[in-house]
Amino acid sequence: FEPKRRGTDLNKALEFLLRVQSHKAVAVVVSDFIGSPAETRRTGQRQLRPQLQLLESLAQASFSMLKQVNRRHDVVAVQITDRYELELPALGRLVLCDAETGEVMEINTGDARKREAFVARQNKALAETARLFRSAGIDSVQLRTDQPYGSALAKFFETREKRRRHG
């Protein structure tokens, strides 16, 4: 398997926005907000055990850039997660390849304790990402690829509008 890309760089997109958009704008950032292992190492965040290193909390470098953009613009973060980023099916030993980096890892999904630890870690990472957005004053919504998103987005923007009108 040869990855089509060598990763994505959210910071480059955000830096571009800061350069080209001089007037205040609503910037909707759609991402999984998963920090790459290299980005995590650069920013000093604690590494997860390699066999469970599928989802990490928002990397500090991207978060700093999002805060910077939010000072000039109105940032809305839409976090997309896949079912299998949040849970591991009991399929035994799996070899996984990261489509962005090409990194290959083997994990044993047959171990119930590892699956439970994985789910707990992923939920903690999602909660931490949402907390970081709130602390920076960035409105955010989490959507899953295996669930309908239309009503969730409508409710999010409806609630956001009410809060902005009355807040």
Can you describe what each PLM-predicted range is?
Residues 33:
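Active-site metal-binding loops of divalent metal-dependent hydrolases
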Residues 23, 39, 46-167:
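Von Willebrand factor type A / integrin I
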